[in-house]
């Protein structure tokens, strides 16, 4: 069967998501090993020698660098999209969840649900992504599969149900009972887990497995209440229910987001990975199951709903940009409708720019294959796109459709950066430009007043990693300043301004006259600039110049020079001079006018507030809470289990520099914390005065 003819129902677009240390990379690596080693579908059991490298290979921590990898299993094509586990990279998680049809959430059998797992789970809820869970690291000291299932219910509000019962635990973990087939699976150590034996359920687990299976069937009956025949069987004769019936009801429940089945295993010891692959195919949705996609028709601003059809109009979303040393700029896309052919001319409807596809590439675990076309349900890479960035829609030139954008959070931390030598200046500019194209949460701005380049990102780790990439990939050395908080400015009342820009110094002069009205926009909505000019008081050709001037004026605030956000600007009146008016004059005038209006609109400084979760031994709880209060923190709540307490709080980022070190000394190194940007809030007056003085 050629790739082109792949049946839509046989495609799975999935992501593997987890907390940073839950073993996501190992799980992904083993999936690639079992499914991606050969392109012959489902041929896995090579056995013996080819496996030798696995056990000696000490966890190298390979992460798929490619955004999407294609493997084959049980006659299905699985596109795996990688998602990072660290909070500084939430945009990566956002953009991958946006294009997924289903996901596998990996949890650590000892820790269960950790703070970062909650963040990723919330993001998956936002996009309605169906999930199955894999409790990993069952061979670790303190592993507890059932406690992990309970923590999913308590902390995530998930409808988590056990579909396995572990046989043995910690170093004695040898396999699991599959509650659906009612068979015990024992993994053979001599094949490093590649093969297993099906045996009868051990005597000591029979009663427990019968209870667990009945609980699973009861849960499935409530998930699909329309299936009365299944419900009656559960009540009257549960043993008569076939595996096929269970899989059918489970698939429906997973796709409708009503149930989250939980498997167990240990990816490092190769136990349970093939079982996970089987249920990815059996339970997670195909693009067909996910149904219509919603967009806007730009010609009439009406909503459109596109069916996932090969012969439908083209609609694709660019979700990641990568720079490849051999191929150049690669744009990863997901096709929701229609077919995209190599060499075709298309429209980037978000930017209203025409693009041409020079090559189409399908990424396998470690190699790329050229393709002539991608069709509905495919995830792949395009070469040749010049203007497209994360979140842009690609469609046919006569079909102006825009899909829902990917939400991009505002950066919260700034650093000054300069090349180590003058010769590196141009290389640094190229590196910064390429990195900001790849990562929309990484911004580069110039502070003209002090002649500095400022880089902004989602956290210290985020900027450190980008700095490493500059050295490794772009061979450019740079000096960076200390991390600074990325403050913003906004206005709190409405105001207006009337500004004239007039210069007369012999010969042709400069003349522009602009009247603006401004008001606060909804928080998080960004700046909006609208022309309400009627009757040609400012000629049509000068309006874009006024808008550009206003936009540039908002880039530097009126209190301390931080960018203004959430301001709505209406251009309402003005005048011009036949000879002396020019685009430049109106641009300068627009910038002056918006600054004047903002000064009168009670401007304030906003600071990033971080959501922090601290996990600490209970005997240090008082110290941790006291310390957060001293940092202007607002405690949101706390919970305790097994001698450990989790404190959730919101704290200004400016108070959190060096927090990890002070938490270590406060708790003798026994507490851990995670932090993620939450929102921007008004700075207290006293602190605002200090910032302005600086």
Swiss-Prot record:
Residues involved in GTP binding: 18-25, 82-86, 136-139
Pfam families: EFG_C, EFG_III, EFG_IV, GTP_EFTU, GTP_EFTU_D2
Signal sequence region: none
Domain tr-type G: 9-288
GO biological process: ribosome disassembly
SUPFAM superfamilies: EF-G C-terminal domain-like (SSF54980), P-loop containing nucleoside triphosphate hydrolases (SSF52540), Ribosomal protein S5 domain 2-like (SSF54211), Translation proteins (SSF50447)
Stored InterPro entries: EFG_II (IPR041095), EFG_III (IPR009022), EFG_III/V (IPR035647), EFG_IV (IPR047872), EFG_V (IPR035649), EFG_V-like (IPR000640), EFTu-like_2 (IPR004161), G_TR_CS (IPR031157)
DNA repair listed as a keyword: no
GO molecular function annotation: GTP binding; GTPase activity; translation elongation factor activity
Family: Belongs to the TRAFAC class translation factor GTPase superfamily. Classic translation factor GTPase family. EF-G/EF-2 subfamily.
Stated name of the protein: Elongation factor G
Source organism: Chlamydia abortus (strain DSM 27085 / S26/3)
Taxonomic placement: Bacteria, Pseudomonadati, Chlamydiota, Chlamydiia, Chlamydiales
Gene: fusA
């Amino acid at each position: 069967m050629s790739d082109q003819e792949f049946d839509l129902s046989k495609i799975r677009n999935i992501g593997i998501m987890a907390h940073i240390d839950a073993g996501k990379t190992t799980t992904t690596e083993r999936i690639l090993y079992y499914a991606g080693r050969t392109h012959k579908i489902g041929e896995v059991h090579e056995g013996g020698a080819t496996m030798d490298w696995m056990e000696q290979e000490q966890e190298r921590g390979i992460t798929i660098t490619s955004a999407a990898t294609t493997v084959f299993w049980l006659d299905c094509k699985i596109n795996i999209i990688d998602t990072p586990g660290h909070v500084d990279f939430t945009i990566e998680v956002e953009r991958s969840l946006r294009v997924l049809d289903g996901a596998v959430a990996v949890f650590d059998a000892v820790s269960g649900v950790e703070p970062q797992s909650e963040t990723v789970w919330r993001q998956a809820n936002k996009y309605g992504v169906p999930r199955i869970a894999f409790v990993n690291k069952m061979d670790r000291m303190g592993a507890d599969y059932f406690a992990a299932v309970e923590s999913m219910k308590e902390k995530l509000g998930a409808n988590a149900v056990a579909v396995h019962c572990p046989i043995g635990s910690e170093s004695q973990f040898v396999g699991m009972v599959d509650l659906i087939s009612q068979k015990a699976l024992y993994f053979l150590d001599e094949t490093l887990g590649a093969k297993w034996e099906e045996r009868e359920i051990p005597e000591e687990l029979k009663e427990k497995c019968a209870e667990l299976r009945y609980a699973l069937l009861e849960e499935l009956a409530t998930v699909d209440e329309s299936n009365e025949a299944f419900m009656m069987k559960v009540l009257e004769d549960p043993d008569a229910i076939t595996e096929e019936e269970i899989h059918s009801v489970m698939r429906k429940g997973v796709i409708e987001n009503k149930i989250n089945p939980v498997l167990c295993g240990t990816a490092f010891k190769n136990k349970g990975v093939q079982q996970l692959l089987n249920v990815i195919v059996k339970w997670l949705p195909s693009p067909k199951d996910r149904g219509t996609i919603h967009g806007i028709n730009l010609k009439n601003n009406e909503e459109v709903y596109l069916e996932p059809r090969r012969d439908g109009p083209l609609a694709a979303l660019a979700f990641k940009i990568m720079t490849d040393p051999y191929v150049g700029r690669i744009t990863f896309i997901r096709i929701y409708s229609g077919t995209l052919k190599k060499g075709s001319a298309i429209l980037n409807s978000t930017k209203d720019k025409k693009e041409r596809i020079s090559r189409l590439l399908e990424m396998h675990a470690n190699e790329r294959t050229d393709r002539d076309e991608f069709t509905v349900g495919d995830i792949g890479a395009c070469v040749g796109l010049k203007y497209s960035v994360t979140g842009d829609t690609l469609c046919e030139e006569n079909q102006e459709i825009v899909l829902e954008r990917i939400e991009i959070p505002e950066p919260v931390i700034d650093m000054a950066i300069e090349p180590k030598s003058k010769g590196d200046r141009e290389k640094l500019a190229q590196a910064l430009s390429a990195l900001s194209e790849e990562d929309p949460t990484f911004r580069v701005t110039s502070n003209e007043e002090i002649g500095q380049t400022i880089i902004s990102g989602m956290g210290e780790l985020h900027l450190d990693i980008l700095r490493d990439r500059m050295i490794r990939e772009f061979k450019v050395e740079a000096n960076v300043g200390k991390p600074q908080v990325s403050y913003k400015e906004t206005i709190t009342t409405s105001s207006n301004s009337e500004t004239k820009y007039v210069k007369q110094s012999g010969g042709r002069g400069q003349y522009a006259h602009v009247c603006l009205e401004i008001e606060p926009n909804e928080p998080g909505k960004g700046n909006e600039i609208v022309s309400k000019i009627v009757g040609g008081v400012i000629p049509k050709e000068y309006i874009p110049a006024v808008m550009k001037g206003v936009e540039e004026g908002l880039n530097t605030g009126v209190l301390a020079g931080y960018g203004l956000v959430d301001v709505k600007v209406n251009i309402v009146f003005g005048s011009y001079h036949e000879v002396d008016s020019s685009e430049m004059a109106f641009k300068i005038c627009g910038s002056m006018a918006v600054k004047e209006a903002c000064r009168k609109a009670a401007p304030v400084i906003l600071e990033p507030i971080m959501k922090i979760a601290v996990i600490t031994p209970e005997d240090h709880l008082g110290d941790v809470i006291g310390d957060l209060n001293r940092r202007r923190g607002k405690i949101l709540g706390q919970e305790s289990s097994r001698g450990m307490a989790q404190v959730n709080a919101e704290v200004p980022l400016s108070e959190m520099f060096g927090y990890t070190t002070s938490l270590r000394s406060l708790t003798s190194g026994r507490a851990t914390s995670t932090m993620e940007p939450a929102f921007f809030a008004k700075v207290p007056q006293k602190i605002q005065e200090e910032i302005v003085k600086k």
